[in-house]
Amino acid sequence: MFIEQPARWLRWLYPKATWRMDKNVRAIYLTFDDGPIPEATPFILDTLKEHGAKATFFMVGDNVKKHPELYERIVAEGHQVGNHTMNHIGGFRHWTTTYIINTYQANELIHAHLFRPPHGWMRHSPYYWLSKYYKVVMWDVVTRDYSTRLTAEEVLENVKRYTRNGSIITFHDSLKSIGKLHYALPEALKWLKEQGYEFRTFE
């Protein structure tokens, strides 16, 4: 999605999904999609640890299979894990059965009760089935750290501009994002703490 906050029509498509947490609590929920990979995950974990922050990692099963030591480190350091399918497959390019099987294959490695669809969307049929067994977590703020059109400073500005109580903030644990995260992530964590936000993970 090329938007920092989801449109109302998108929220309407997935009414059972979680888009934002309690707006009356000064807390936010950090999420990282697409990892784990050795080029990005260690830096993210080190930075989170330095700032005393916990996050939820929506991981691709194939990456977990390739880098089990990173999965183990994420869990050992007290972060939450979520399913992001086995092969980061698009929700509109595959049959429902294929999509669900791919998700279940990933969960044999990830062992999660949380799910986020790659690219933030999927057909209604897999959504219907997966929402029976997973808590489907979407987002309230997309930092767009993956965009080649944005600078690291602009990624940080997206966090500052759109974050509010209960925001689910999406970063990416990926090659496309890591260059910007070296600056944007520590600065974002510092700013969030200065604003009095508590870092939380999902039940």
Predicted features by range, described:
Residues 1-31, 36-51, 66-67, 187-203:
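N-terminal pre-catalytic segment of deacetylase/amide-hydrolase enzymes
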Residues 35-39, 58-67, 89-97, 116-123, ...:
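Acidic-and-aromatic substrate-binding clefts and catalytic sites of carbohydrate-active enzymes
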Residues 69-72, 96-103, 151-157, 182-186:
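Charged helix-capping and loop-helix junction motifs
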Residues 113, 121, 126-160, 196-203:
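His/Asp/Glu-enriched short active-site or ligand-binding loop at hydrolase and phosphoryl-transfer sites
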Residues 50-77:
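A short, conserved beta-to-alpha structural element at the edge of catalytic cores
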Residues 159-203:
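Catalytic grooves of carbohydrate-active enzymes
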Residues 32-34, 59-62, 83-85, 117-119, ...:
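A cross-domain feature marking catalytic cores of carbohydrate-active enzymes
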Residues 45-54, 79-80, 86, 96-124, ...:
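CE4/NodB-like, metal-dependent polysaccharide N-deacetylase domain
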